[in-house]
């Protein structure tokens, strides 16, 4: 009887456990988690903040699901892996033997690197406990400052403002999420943020978090502005959890390196989800993602290979959809507003939760983009070599599914490229007509 151990109870780990049970009815399957909850939806944390969903509704698996599938869930921290003896040592003193091991430990929010980063009142939207802490603090907080440039920072700002906390949002550059949004898109998002009562401070960076008696009292910016606050929300990115690799022969870079079968350099040891650095055919490099669909897909393929298949992982097009201040956002494929350059180096040091390194990999010759904007919605396409390689939609989502299909299948759009590149209504019509024709022909 095979012994499978999975470290991590998130999307990758639970998907793997489910797939292993489907493929092997008799195996012993153990999932190790350092959180007290069954699997929950990390993308759903933002909706808990604004009371769109309850904690109960955010649970992707109920406690009895593990029992029904004969999967042992151990709530303890994995402290050490002995790859030679094939054992995992837990903080509760228990040791687990494995025939095949999956490391799916995810990624963790980067802690505040500023002076005062240790003070009480600094919060992160990184897990369920963090989310509940923000909700608790919002009951008494008068003012908050949010620092960060991605989806999570915007979600945190929206959540605090929703609870009537005076909220300030620091933006390092002169437009929002500059690694992804162009100026027009930034203005569209800005309009929604201001409508929700959030104060935006462009060109400001955190110089120091000030405190008294160990608690946050203010934030000082690089321009000398002091913003009184009770809470500082930090969302400057996430980094893969690599502690288990320290002092071992497990090969890591930004994440745990895997081959095309999601196996690490150590036999029968696999990695999946946010902690894994996986080959990406879109860029030709090994990339890190912090995307829910990627975690699910990689967890499933890892499980198949753990059970004896030789199934290569073919990473799909990076995709994420979010609702920010009432504005729907969808990012598909390579969507950077501009190529990666030295000025973005700091911003790209850590990937944002819900983002992909592929999004910002559009640097280089041969890329053209088209734009459509009606004042409340926008669509932007990025084309290279007669193939749409990326799209970013704000507001109206009518083109989301068609564009995802066209990008995923790398459809040649040369016959409608002129209409696509003209932007506006002609661009939207060309996308929909092309997709409709291909559906009729059974090609998408």
Q: What kind of feature is each model-predicted range?
A:
Residues 1-72, 159-180, 398, 402:
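Beta1-alpha1 glycine-rich phosphate/pyrophosphate-binding loop at the start
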Residues 413-444:
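Cysteine/selenocysteine-centered motifs that mediate thiol-based redox chemistry or coordinate metal-sulfur cofactors
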Residues 8-12, 126-127, 147-150:
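Glycine-rich Rossmann-fold phosphate-binding loop(s) that bind the pyrophosphate
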Residues 1-5, 61-145, 220-224, 233-235, ...:
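FAD-binding core/adjacent interface of flavoenzyme oxidoreductases
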Residues 397-416:
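A short, polar/charged loop-to-alpha-helix boundary motif
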Residues 26-30, 72-89, 96, 162-260:
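A Rossmann-like FAD-binding core segment of flavoenzymes
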Residues 118-141, 211-220, 224-304, 417:
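FAD-site-proximal beta/loop scaffold in flavoenzymes
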Residues 2-3, 22, 275-397:
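Mid-to-C-terminal Rossmann-like scaffold of FAD/NAD(P)H-dependent oxidoreductases
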């Amino acid at each position: 009887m095979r012994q499978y151990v999975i470290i991590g109870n998130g999307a990758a780990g639970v998907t793997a456990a489910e797939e292993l049970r489907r493929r092997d009815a008799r195996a012993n399957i153990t999932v190790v988690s350092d959180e007290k909850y069954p699997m929950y939806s990390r993308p759903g944390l933002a909706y808990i903040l604004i009371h769109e969903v309850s904690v109960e509704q955010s649970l992707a698996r109920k406690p009895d699901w593990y029992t029904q599938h004969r999967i042992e869930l151990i709530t303890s921290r994995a402290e050490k892996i002995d790859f030679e003896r094939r054992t995992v040592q837990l903080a509760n003193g228990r040791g687990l033997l494995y025939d095949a091991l999956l490391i799916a430990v995810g990624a963790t929010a980067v802690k505040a690197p500023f002076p005062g980063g240790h003070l009480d009142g600094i919060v992160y939207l990184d897990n369920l406990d963090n989310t509940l802490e923000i909700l608790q603090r919002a009951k008494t907080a008068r003012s908050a400052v949010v620092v960060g440039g991605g989806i999570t920072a915007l979600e945190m700002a929206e959540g605090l403002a929703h609870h009537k906390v005076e909220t300030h949002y620091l933006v390092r550059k002169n437009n929002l999420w500059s690694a992804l949004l162009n100026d027009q898109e930034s203005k569209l998002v800005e309009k929604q943020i201001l409508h929700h009562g959030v104060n935006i401070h462009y060109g400001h960076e955190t110089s120091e978090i000030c405190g008294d008696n160990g608690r946050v009292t203010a934030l000082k910016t690089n321009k000398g502005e002091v913003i009184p606050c009770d809470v500082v929300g930090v969302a400057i990115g996430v980094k893969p959890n690599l502690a288990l690799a320290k002092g071992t022969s497990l090969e890591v870079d930004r994440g745990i390196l895997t081959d095309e079968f999601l196996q690490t350099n150590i036999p029968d040891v696999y990695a999946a989800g946010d902690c894994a650095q996986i080959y990406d055919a879109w860029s030709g490099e090994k990339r890190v993602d912090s995307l829910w669909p990627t975690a699910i897909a990689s967890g499933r393929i890892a499980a198949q290979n753990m059970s004896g298949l030789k199934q290569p992982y073919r990473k799909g097009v990076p995709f994420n959809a979010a609702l920010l201040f009432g504005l729907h956002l969808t990012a598909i494929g390579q969507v950077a507003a501009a190529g990666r350059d030295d000025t973005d180096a700091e911003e790209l040091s850590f990937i944002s939760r819900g983002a992909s390194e592929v999004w910002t990999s559009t640097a280089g010759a041969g890329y053209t983009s088209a734009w459509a904007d009606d004042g409340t919605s926008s669509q932007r396409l990025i084309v290279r070599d007669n193939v749409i390689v990326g799209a970013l939609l704000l507001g109206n989502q009518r083109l989301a599914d068609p564009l995802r299909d066209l990008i995923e299948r790398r459809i040649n759009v040369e016959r409608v490229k002129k209409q696509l590149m003209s932007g506006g209504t002609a661009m939207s019509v060309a996308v929909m007509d092309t997709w409709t024709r291909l559906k009729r022909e059974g090609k998408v």
